[in-house]
Structure formats: C-alpha cells, structure tokens
C-alpha cells in the first residue's frame, strides 16, 4: 500500500513560540490520526531542530529546499547532507515559489533530486501548471514534462524515496482549489507518466497541494490516486492541520 502523507509546509513563517505551541498541539493530538498516516512538518530550516524536539518522535521533519551542490563556497545554501544531519526525512524540490521567484528550472530540480536521493532522504518533487497553461489546455503536457525532467536522475533502486506533489500554481494561496475530480484526473496522468518512465507507479505516493483545508480534504483524499496533501496556510493552525490529517477514508 502506498504511503499516506500529510506534510505541512510553513514557508517563511514561524517563530520559536509558534513551534512550541503548534507542534506541541499537533503532537498531543497525533494519536487520533491513523497509524498509516505520516505527519510531516516542513518549517524554515532554522527551526528544524526545535520542531523535531517538540515532535517527540511522532512527527517527521522535512526541509523546504536544499542546494543542487553537495558542499563548498555557496553562501546561504544548505546541502541535502546537512538536512539529513538535522534529522529530516523529506525535502521539497521544485516548489512553484522556488520556480517563479528564484528562477529554478527543471534541470535545477533534477540536480536537487539527485542530491536528496544520494543523501538517503525522500525527495518530494513539486509540479503544477499556471492558470494560463491550464486555459491553453497545456496543463497535462506541462506537468508531464516537469515529472520527466525532475525525476530523470532517479535510478532503479531509488524510487521508494520519491514522492510527487501536484500543486496547480493557480490554487496555491489563492483560496481556489481544483475539484476532487480535476485533481484525481491529473494524479492519474502523473501515474501514467511515471509508468512510462519504468517507475513502480502504483507504489509512489502522489500528494495534492493548493488551498487544502479541513472542509475539502476528505473529498480529495477519497480519490484513488490522491495519497495525501502538501498543506500550506492551514498547516499553521494546529486544529485545522490535525483535522486534515484525520480526513482519509477509513478501511482503505
């Protein structure tokens, strides 16, 4: 069975006080989440140690970004090895904000995926189309190319450490959400692309992101090819985040 994952991406938000309050609350309520659901918090790197400590072993941590280089004179960068040294289990790669604001390309994403996998961590490749691309009927082609390029470096024995997160750019932080049917359709296409790459497509978790909230998570997570969520703003509210983590259908 594929891993069920709910990952909270805090982006550039947080403080020491928030870590204590929010992570502590999530930890205390994590017992009400299904045993087959992995709860991941992805804070700014400076708070990784604190989140891990507050998580008490019940929460996995992840890094929002790592360098495409292994080490060296790259001021301000954090390597995948450093993320592992900090106890991370996951690393986001190619988030749309990295692509749009910092000019990261598919080739940069591929280089980062390679570093993450070499470090023994799980790479979460983020893919998604803009509104203009969707309206031009290019959504599937754009996402397929992002998947193929970003995961072109994955070797046969590394697919168990790959997760894909589909985040339509037009839905991130806008309050707009793809319908469950639309999200399922794209997740199914992503799985077909993975299958075409000779990856074990039915074993790879594909998450949905883009204004996921407690009131729409259940409908999304009920779809057969949606294995969880990459959560933005809602992950900064303990009750809502835990509610999302509880939104998987029972007995599946």
Swiss-Prot record:
Q: Which CDD domains match?
A: TIM
- Cellular compartments per GO CC: cytosol
* Biological processes per GO annotation: gluconeogenesis; glyceraldehyde-3-phosphate biosynthetic process; glycerol catabolic process; glycolytic process
Its gene is tpiA
Provide the alphabetized UniProt keywords. Cytoplasm, Gluconeogenesis, Glycolysis, Isomerase
Q: Which family does it belong to?
A: Belongs to the triosephosphate isomerase family.
- Report any Pfam family annotated for this entry: TIM
Name the UniProt record assigns to this protein: Triosephosphate isomerase
């Amino acid at each position: 069975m594929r891993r069920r994952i709910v990952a909270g991406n805090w982006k550039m938000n947080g403080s020491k006080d928030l870590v204590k309050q929010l992570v502590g609350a999530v930890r205390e309520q994590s017992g009400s989440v299904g045993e087959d659901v992995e709860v991941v918090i992805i804070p700014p790197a400076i708070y990784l140690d604190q989140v891990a400590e507050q998580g008490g072993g019940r929460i996995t941590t992840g890094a929002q970004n790592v360098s495409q280089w292994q080490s060296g004179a790259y001021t301000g960068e954090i390597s995948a090895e450093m993320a592992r040294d900090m106890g991370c289990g996951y690393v986001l790669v190619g988030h749309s904000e990295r692509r749009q604001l910092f000019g990261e390309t598919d080739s940069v994403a591929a280089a980062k995926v390679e570093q993450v996998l070499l470090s023994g961590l799980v790479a979460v490749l983020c893919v998604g189309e803009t509104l203009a691309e969707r309206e031009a009927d290019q959504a599937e082609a754009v996402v397929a190319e992002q998947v193929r390029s970003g995961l072109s470096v994955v070797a046969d024995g590394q697919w168990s450490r790959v997760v894909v997160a589909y985040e339509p750019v037009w839905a991130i932080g806008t309050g707009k959400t793809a319908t469950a049917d639309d999200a399922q359709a794209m997740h199914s296409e992503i799985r077909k692309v993975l299958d075409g790459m000779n990856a074990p497509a039915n074993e790879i978790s594909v998450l949905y992101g883009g204004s996921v909230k407690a009131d729409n998570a259940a409908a999304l997570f009920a779809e057969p090819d949606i294995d969880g969520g990459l959560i933005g703003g809602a992950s900064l509210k303990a009750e809502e985040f835990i509610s999302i983590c509880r939104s998987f259908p029972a007995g599946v």
